[in-house]
Amino acid sequence: MKSTKLVLGLLVLLMASAFTVTTSANWKLKEDAYSVTFKGGKVDGIIKVLNTSILFDEANPEQSKITALLDVSTINTGNGMMNKHAKSETGLNAKEFPVIKFESVAVTGNGGMFSAIGKLTIKGITKEIKLPFTFENKGAEGVFKGTFNIVTKDFNITRTGTPDVLEIALNIPVTNQ
């Protein structure tokens, strides 16, 4: 009888250890503290976030899911004419495509450095990108930081004077929900 209980106990323990529990945290953007900037050539500016969904677990990054929507109408280069050009049909075409979307399909991490592989949609064109980032965990708060480049012609941004490559920099302070 004792040996049966021991065997059953070991079997239950073995089965329980085969399943891992993930503890991904749901992070909320700090509305007035973030920055999404772009620069390239003589162009630089900011764009505002419309919405985010950040489910991130630094111990198990493969369980993470990140989605962000940016509001094209909020582009600000500090120059009214340049803003108008950026939102025009040969720029980002804010009228027809008011949102830029990023949605991760995989998140990996190693030694505090992470990468979100995802689909970036600009002007109705979707390309897979790799977004390297760091995460500074401060308990109930944290900060995501990352930089990546986009080739403007890949997204049919053809306005004369537009740089071939734009560097996008993210500084995203968050709170744990």
Per-segment meaning from a language model:
Residues M1-N26:
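Bacterial Sec-dependent N-terminal signal peptides
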